Amino acid sequence: MPADTPIRKKPNAYASVVDPDTGYCTPGAFELERLFWHGAPKYNHVNEVWPNLYIGDEKTALDRYSLEKNGFTHILNAAHGRWNVDTGPEYYSDITVEYYGVEAEDLPSFNLSQFFYPAAQFIRNALSSPSSKVLVNCAMGRSRSASLVLAYLMIYENMTVVDSIMQVLKHRCILPNRGFLKQLRELDIQLALERRGTEDTAKKAQKDD
């Protein structure tokens, strides 16, 4: 490589990103990790983290009797698969629930972001009915399931990544792995740009009127 050839650096996932138009700052990954250092509720098998939206673990997902007794209508399994939380439509065939499975591994290298929008849409559709109760589970109810719930709050409840984390931490002890946090951070940047574009379009329309 010639000496004067510029070296392209990879984007730093740990650096904060500031939107110059709104002043909103998407925190760096390290700053997001620090949010989990503070106290959180005692670990339980399942917690309601948003109205009618629950995060739970494998024990919760496997207990069909309790799911039916407590009125759950939708289950999003973020650890679907034979070697994970092996449930599915057939497992729940004796109770009335709608099932959605995501085959995800709790690894920093796993691309969970490919499921952010489909999972968020499933949750949104379920919560459109006031009588629905949604369980989002994985093995421990701390990383995969929590990340999908955070993405839902960001996409459909218009929360920032920090707001969504703080909302869930009020009710449940969660700890998404570092790779998932980076992907949620990227989603935050993307959503901030989309919202700015929507605001710019609205302002332009007002001027045209």
Curated annotation (Swiss-Prot):
Its EC number is 3.1.3.16, 3.1.3.48. One of its GO terms (cellular component) is cytoplasm. PROSITE patterns: TYR_PHOSPHATASE_2, TYR_PHOSPHATASE_DUAL. It is an enzyme of class 3 (hydrolase). It comes from the Eukaryota. InterPro entries: Atypical_DUSP_subfamA, Dual-sp_phosphatase_cat-dom, Prot-tyrosine_phosphatase-like, Tyr_Pase_dom, TYR_PHOSPHATASE_DUAL_dom. Substrate binds at N137, C138, A139, M140, G141, R142, S143, R144. It is found in: Cytoplasm; Nucleus. The active site is at C138. It catalyses: O-phospho-L-tyrosyl-[protein] + H2O = L-tyrosyl-[protein] + phosphate; O-phospho-L-seryl-[protein] + H2O = L-seryl-[protein] + phosphate; O-phospho-L-threonyl-[protein] + H2O = L-threonyl-[protein] + phosphate. Keywords: Cytoplasm, Hydrolase, Nucleus, Protein phosphatase. Residues 44-193 form the Tyrosine-protein phosphatase domain. GO terms for molecular function: protein serine/threonine phosphatase activity; protein tyrosine phosphatase activity; protein tyrosine/serine/threonine phosphatase activity. One of its GO terms (biological process) is protein dephosphorylation. Pfam families: DSPc (PF00782). Dual specificity phosphatase able to dephosphorylate phosphotyrosine, phosphoserine and phosphothreonine residues within the same substrate, with a preference for phosphotyrosine as a substrate. Involved in the modulation of AMPK and MAPK1/2 signaling pathways. Belongs to the protein-tyrosine phosphatase family. Non-receptor class dual specificity subfamily. This is Dual specificity phosphatase 29. It comes from Xenopus tropicalis.
